[in-house]
């Protein structure tokens, strides 16, 4: 087994009828989240279906991005004792429902709306088919 996969943090399964994780964090993504939390408080992710920055996972202070029935909660991470939700637009989920998502981080400029932007880092999604 690939050691990078073994060290990923899986989100708890939350969709009705499912018992598997749909989303994970790489160790690097978790480390960045732990650095961002003291600055911004509790955090959340939202993945929209837009183009450009809209196709990247956006990290917000929890509650700053308002979710609705147009969004799906894909998973909840336990990041050292604090919950971190990962949401996706329902429309995007229809395209990606057969996909496992891994949140990773790379050096580079992301969206100015996502809290990691001033760090010179950006979150991105790596995906693979479920199953």
Go through the PLM ranges and name each one.
Residues 1-131:
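Domain-level signature for proteins that mediate thiol-based redox and metal-cofactor handling
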């Amino acid at each position: 087994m690939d050691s990078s996969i073994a060290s990923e943090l899986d989100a708890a399964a939350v969709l009705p009828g499912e018992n598997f994780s749909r989303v994970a964090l790489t160790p690097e993504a978790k480390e960045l989240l732990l650095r961002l939390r003291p600055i911004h408080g509790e955090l959340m992710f939202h993945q929209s279906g837009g183009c450009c920055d809209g196709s990247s996972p956006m990290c917000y202070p929890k509650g700053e991005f308002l979710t609705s029935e147009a969004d799906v909660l894909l998973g909840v991470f336990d990041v050292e004792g604090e919950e971190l939700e990962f949401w996706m637009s329902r429309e995007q989920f229809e395209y990606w429902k057969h996909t496992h998502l891994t949140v990773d981080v790379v050096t580079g400029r992301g969206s100015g709306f996502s809290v990691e932007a001033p760090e010179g880092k950006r979150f991105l999604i790596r995906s693979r088919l479920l199953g």
